[in-house]
Amino acid sequence: MGLSNKFKSFFFLDEEEEYYEEEVAREPEPMQKKTKKEKPNKNRFYAVEEDDAKVVSMQGAQFSSRMVLAEPRVYAEAQELADYLKEYKSVVVNLQRISHDQATRIVDFLSGTVYALGGDIQRVGNNIFLCTPDNVEVDGSISEMLDEQNFM
């Protein structure tokens, strides 16, 4: 019996050795009003709250809008066009001097890019496309002319 008691005492606590701790009830401390600090944000526009007054930074309005005109000759130039979109620049792409297969691949690549960036791609002419990032809004449509012509 001595050996089995040693195993029991080793693996299990005897009733005499069990300890219970009583938790002391704490009174909740009064909460202090915390002020929010301005945190840097990767977005171009962000709101800063100061003492219940809402202030919106117009930092993005200071940047001038830029548009890039491109006429790629090979598919490898599509990545450069995507880099312009990542820099919040609109890109007009003229695909008239490239083969149909290469033009289709470039349009597919740019479509994926503008989708990932939340932008838009629109056909504005025969093999001419306008790619815009999410901070640019395009108004109007020239679809009536496009429907009359035969495109890619």
Curated annotation (Swiss-Prot):
One BP annotation, GO: FtsZ-dependent cytokinesis
Keyword Cytoplasm: yes
Cited HAMAP family: SepF
Listed transmembrane segments: none
Family according to the record: Belongs to the SepF family.
Protein name (record): Cell division protein SepF
Main location: cytoplasm
Keyword Coiled coil appears in the UniProt entry: no
Quaternary assembly: Homodimer. Interacts with FtsZ.
Pfam families xref list: SepF
Task performed by this protein: Cell division protein that is part of the divisome complex and is recruited early to the Z-ring. Probably stimulates Z-ring formation, perhaps through the cross-linking of FtsZ protofilaments. Its function overlaps with FtsA.
GO cellular component: cytoplasm
Annotated organism of origin: Listeria monocytogenes serovar 1/2a (strain ATCC BAA-679 / EGD-e)
Key words, A-Z: Cell cycle, Cell division, Cytoplasm, Septation
Location relative to the cell: Cytoplasm
InterPro entries: Cell_div_SepF, Cell_div_SepF/SepF-rel, SepF-like_sf
